[in-house]
Structure formats: C-alpha cells, structure tokens
Amino acid sequence: LPSHLDERCIRHPGPAAPSAGFVVHWMRAALRLDENPTFDVARTIAEGLGLPLVIYQGIDERYPHASYRHHRFLLEGAADVAHRAEELGIRHVLHVARDGHREPALLRLAEEAAVVVTDLVDLEPWSAWTGAIAKIRPVIEVDAHCVLPRPVFGRTANRPFRFKDATKREMKRRMGQPWPRCTANLEPLSPSWTPPFTPVDAAAALRKDGAVSLLATCRIDPSVVPVAGMTGGASAGMARWASYLNEGLSRYHRTRNNAANRGGVSGMSPWLHHGMVAATRLVRDAAEHGTKGAEKFLDEMLVFREHAYHHAHDVDRPYAWDHVPDWARASWRNTALVHPARPAMDLERAQSNDVLWNAAQRGVVRHGVMHNNVRMTWGKGTVQWMEDPEAAMRLTQDLNDRYALDGRNPNSIAGVMWCFGLFDRPFDPPEVRMGRVRRRDPRDHAARLDLRAYRGWTEAHAGSKRLNVGIVGGGLSGRFAARLLSDLGHEVTVYDKGRRASGRLSDRTASDGTPFQLGAPRVEGWPSWAERHVQDWIERGYLDVDGEHPVVTLPPLLDHLGEGLNVRQLHRVDGLEATPEGARLRIISPNGPLEVNHDHVLVAAPLEQSRALLETAGIHVEGRSEACWVAWGPAPDHAIEPPAGWTLTRRGQDRATLEVRLDPEQSAADLERSLPDMAVVVATTLGLDPNGWAAHRWRFSRPIEGPEHVVHQGAFSVIGDAFGAPIGTAGAALDSAARAVADLHCTVGWQPSEVSARAQQTDLSAWGA
C-alpha cells in the first residue's frame, strides 16, 4: 500500500481462503466512495491480488439505539453509495436485517473473500464484530474518519490544548493536502455471482413508500421517528457543505455560539458521524478558505473532534464513568440535589422545570439535532434532577445517542463526559450541586440567547407539516400513539366511547371496595425498545416489578398516558370517510351527532370493531378474536377445586371476592348466555349461592388471528394488538402504535443531490511519494 493508506491501517490476521473469489469492502462507518481511505485500500489490495471487489453494507438491528430515525438516515446513505458504485462499475450489496433475513450475511460473504477491509471503529459492538470476522478471514481496519490517523497517533490527553500541542505540527502538514487519486484497475465480478443473501435496493424502498414496508420488518425502535429536512448520503452532505462553505463559514467565529440562529453552524455532524463526508475534505476546504470563521472551524475539527476520536481509540470502554477525572468523581460524591428529583421519562419528554433545557430536549426529540453550544448546557442539566451523577451521565448519553443523528460517536461521548469533568479542570469554590465541575447555568445561557427564536425552531413540529390526527379508541395503543404524536408537536384528539379509560383493560370494585382487574389480567410481550417505558411505569407504581401485572389495576396507567391530551370520552365513532384533505369522522357525542375532519386517522379499536368501522370507508381487514367470560362474587371460606378451563383468583384486601375466568374454549360454549344467567351458572357450578354474583362477557377478549402489522390505506391507519407482534399482547398494541406514528414521518422518494461528493484529487506527489 502507498504510505498515505498504509499509515491508516490496523491488520487483524485470520485464516487464508482456500479459493478466494473477491475482496470485500465492509462499509460500516464511512458511507461514501469518494475520498474514502477504506475504499482505496480495498481496491488497491483487490488490484494487487487480481480479484474483483465487492462493497458490502449491512444495516443491523443490533447497533445501540437502532431506530426508524437512524435506519432511515442509513438507508438514504446506502442509496447514495449504490448510486455512486454503479457509476464506478463496482458491485454494492446491501443487507438489512429483518424478519426472514437475519442470516449471518457478512460471515458467509467473508468465507468467499481473500480479505475483508473495513472502517476503523473503536466502539462496541463494532469492535466485537471485527473480531468475529477475523476468525474467518484476515481483516484490515482503516481510519476513514480522522485527518491525523489514529494508528499514527492514537493517544488521549487530559486537556484539549495538550492534544493540540502534541499534534499541531502534523495537523498543519496534513490539513491542506489533497487526497491522492486511486487509479486501481479492478477485475470485473462475474455476472453470474449472487450474494449469500437477498440484497435490498434502498433507493427503491425509499421511492416505494418511504421504506415503511421495509422498516416494518425490522426489530428497531419506532418511537424515534425519521426527521424532515436532513437526508442521509454523501451527495446530500456535500450539498449542505457547499452551501455553508459559500454562505456561512466566513462568519462562523461570530455565529457559532448563537443557538437561535440555526444556520450559524455547518450542521455537518450527522454526515461526519456516518462518514458520508470526508473530514479531510472539509478541513482542506476550510484551510483554503482562509477566513477567521474558517480558522475557528478548523480548531473545532482538528482539536476537539480529533481529540475525541483519538481518546476513544486509546482507552477501553470510552463510555465508562471511571474515565471522568479522579478530582471530578471525588467532588461529585460531596454534592447534593437542589431541585426535586424527576423521573428519567419526564426528562426524556422535556418535562423539567427549566425552559431552555426543555427546548433543547424537544429539539433533539423532534429534529434529531442539538446546537453544540446549548448541548454543553443541556448536558449538565440532567444531574440537576437525578441524585446519582453517574446515572445522570448515563441518561444524558442515552438521550443523545437515542435521538441525535450524530450520537453513538466519540465526539458525543466526549461531549457528554466533558459535562461531568472529562478534559476539564476543577473550579473552586465548590458549588452545591456541581461541586468543582464547571457550571453552565441555563438561566444565564437563556439570558444571552434570543430564547423565543431558539424555541421557534426546536419546538416546531416534527415532520414536514403539523398534523391534525384523530384517534379512534382510547386504549393502550390509542393513548400511546396520541402521546407520541403530541410530544412531536402535532394536534391530536382521541375519541373513546366509554365513560372513562378502560376498554379491555377495565377494572371493577370488590365487595370491600378494593378495585380489581376485570379486563386483561396482565400486559406482556413488550418489545425491547419499550423497556424504558415499562420501567417508568414500574417506578410510578402502575406495574409490578415483573412489568406485566398491575400493582392494583390497569386503568390508572391509561389515565397516566392520557395526561395532557385531548381525550373525549362518550364519543362513539360510527363512520369514516376519505376526503381530498384527509379523513372525516362521523361521531355520536353526548351533544348529538358530529362530523370532524382530520389530516389522518388512527383506528385503535378492537379488531372486530375496527373491521366494521373501516368497512364504512371501504377498508377490509382480516382477523379473529377469542372470547372470555369473567364472573365474580362473594368468596367462600373454604377452598374450591375449579372445573377444567376455569381460573379462580381471590381479590380485594380481605380476599373476600372470588374472580372466575373461563378459558376461550369454555367461554365459547356459553358465549350467548345473558350476563345474569352466566353469573348464576358460574356460582352454582362452584356450589355457591349466586346472590351477589355478576358476570362480564369479553366477546373480543384477545385477537388470535390478524395482520400482525399496521394497516395503512390513504388517510387511515389501523393499530392495536392485532396489528403488531406478538399478536394479542400489550407489546403488539404499543409497537403498532409507535410504528404508525413513525410511518407518518417517512417521506416518500429519494434522489441523489445535484452537488457532487467527488473530491478534487491529485497524485501522490503532495505526499512525498
């Protein structure tokens, strides 16, 4: 390899291939083909071996905080890479892990390869994945992110100025160097070759339906929705950079700290994070620019950004609390809360008592970005409402990585940890909460900021327009969808035919006045992404520690989900109609018939009720529910042996109420009995006096057949426990609700941006070769 490539490589020996068919470029963190050292290493090696090159890109479900937002950005990047690869005549194959396609695609591909060349990533799980592939074939990791390669320097420093002093000579030498042109001539791949998996055409998926149908098959977090106005890919990234280079860079030194001016910074961090643009290109352009703004931009790129990457390369477990300096950790042990503690979910939903902090959090939730100057203040905020500083740091990292398009990155790791003392010095005298760690009072920050203008963009609705959404059904799926939409800045109205929040999660009151669960006795099947929500409900006392059983009953959980929402009880929707603008609902309300228009309607009623309602709009859904009889009455003092298919549970504080549940088979046999008759049958079958007994028939207790995915047709979407998986569970209800909301934010279409991502390249003379 020429020196400018060789210095960027870390080699992992592995078994040689008995008969190699090609070289694999495993594209995972540098999603571009122009000015990409990994690509250049791969094609140089392929030429030397006389082999074709295959570019493999995988979008996995197992990366931290995998979500619709991050997946969508990655799919756009993949579409851009595929477009450029076709121009270059090189085969690019994309594997998206999803239902029916979770095979070890890369391992199988590596078995056919001579060597696997990939981007250097110092974080887990990517490091572990590198090791797994190295057991199959030799792997070469290439630094495609830094101006000064990590294999050349790769050391941390306790302060940024020390890193700057240690690297300034090399940075000065490198920052203006054009990237050498790679002139490798590659052997063509056989037209008959097929990859050991079914490749995905990302551009086709985006053009078809905004990748909605593809994302529906991925086990990822749908509650983190795609963002508007930020398209992944090298061409989109370079178009953004070209605009900023021409119009904003010269003023960067004056505008970069004004968070109210969203255009005052380049906003390039999401594309830099994914390696969709080359840091070497941006640095070279800024060096040629020669303005004071460019000088400050170079300082950010070559000191703070590079320092973070070299730090993550040098230390184990870059996220770990023990990397915070000893003086800071000792200081934190002697601090105390000033404000009342708040639940983590309140903070995630921007419900603190600080206006600036809330505005910043809403901005990253809705738009996937946060102004860096505010991020330094925001990052020091969570510890104001959490007793344990280490837990506060973990939550801050979690929020940043979950929502920010530039999260899960050495820069964001270092940025969050700086808020807790990393790369900083002590400040005395100690403060009550922050101790000796640098303070950034949000009130002071807000005072020097045009807060109204800042909130104007951070608190704007997610997506391309503010939606007016109607939701039919106020159960778990309906209320969860409503809360997500409301948190994203949309207008939402929930219509429920009952007097209060209940539905199939309803309760009753035992003879001693204690409420007990009449509807679904447990909530289960939670998707992994919902763990933080379930934990929140446990901590608030709605669910038992197992996350499945109510502490008392489940309607209080529904009431909690409906807090602050426009929920209209006793509003029965009896008709749907598509309109040119969206959808119209026909409603029977306490004040008489109504007709209400919405941009979109989510139908969240039980399956059979949804079917009948949807047919009024010409929409047909298939499915079937099972029935369940529940009866209750005074409990005897003695034990009772229940008949087959009957479950007996004593309820109430004095256990004086006996609840009887019949399984679906037993319930179906008596389905058409009247309620009073069934109460008598149950009591007498148990040998008890029927006085004081009552019964309830759940004709549609739980779906057992259904689509198991959200159904969309025009302005209508159908959600609930029949429209998710596992069918018939609370998890399915929650998952379908979140996916329907995410789908509303998936814009349809994709085209490469007109500004080319191709770098101005040169020969090796500038590198002394």
Predicted stretch roles:
Residues 1-186, 293, 362, 381, ...:
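Trp/Phe/Arg-rich N-terminal binding region typifying the photolyase-homology
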Residues 156-313, 317-322, 453-456:
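Glycine/tryptophan-enriched, flexible segments
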Residues 466-495:
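N-terminal Rossmann-like FAD-binding beta1-loop-alpha1 element of flavoenzymes
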Residues 486-511:
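Glycine-rich FAD pyrophosphate-binding loop
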Residues 502, 591-643, 688:
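Central helical "cap/lid" subdomain
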Residues 507, 696-724:
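FAD-binding beta-loop-beta segment adjacent to the flavin cofactor pocket
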Residues 569-584:
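A conserved short coil-to-beta-strand element within the FAD-binding core of flavoproteins
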Residues 663-701:
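Flavin-binding catalytic cores
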